[in-house]
Amino acid sequence: MYGLIHAPLHGEVAYFDVGQGDSILLRTPFNRRISLIDTGGRLAFPQPKWVPATPHSYGATYTNINYLRSRGIDHVDDLYLTHHDADHIGDLPAFLKELRVKRLLVPAGMEQEPQWQHLIRQSRWPTVVQPIRIGSAVPLTVRHPYEAAPAENANSLALQGDFGGLNFLFMGDLDQAGEQKILADHPQLRTDVLKLGHHGSKTASAPAFIQQLRPRWAVISAGHQNRYGHPHAETLATLQAAQVPTVSTQTSGMIRYVYTGNHGRWQTKLKGE
């Protein structure tokens, strides 16, 4: 029984509810391979001088890391960091301190940026930083970026893979210009499950992109009542016009596709349930 609990027979794709951020678990059956796309994290906004400073804490300790430990997971084989924004990689120190992260995969160019490298200094174990781009030999198919550049939204990783009989496409914070590049190179590209770029912002998910991909489902990772108004009404209208069922972490909490073989089921779980 212990072995079954700590090495589950099923696999899963789990979109964590990390507020206004991204973090996605890709776990194959029996925990054979543990991959994550982003860690989540808080965007830092300037505070008035009269606001007292508070000790920094990482939400991941109570959300995605806690979930991994509940599944008997003490390591991460591949941690993909889509770009350098804090809402995607801000909780990286917590992962490096509490779990053995074997490899960090970043968009080509990000490995040269000193601004984020301080985040890896707290790692308890050695970890490899590997820059990737189109054509890189990694478990997921890299759809973007095409060349080394600063790790901003426009150079975000876009990753694709198959799990439980479905094809998944994860867009990070990639914008519409990046979507156009992908379609130009792959005019027949399709996917079953699309994780929308940039939390459902109108800067991503162009109508032509959605129409070409023909996703069966769309997933949005966004914070409840976030200050950006994500997901944007234009994006939701685009999905509705294309008749794409959509689910968001801000209303459904954690979203999971749990699978065995080529069959699976969708589950949602609000915090506190």
Question: What is each of the regions a protein language model found here?
Answer:
Residues 1-273:
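Non-globular, low-confidence helical/coil segments that flank catalytic cores
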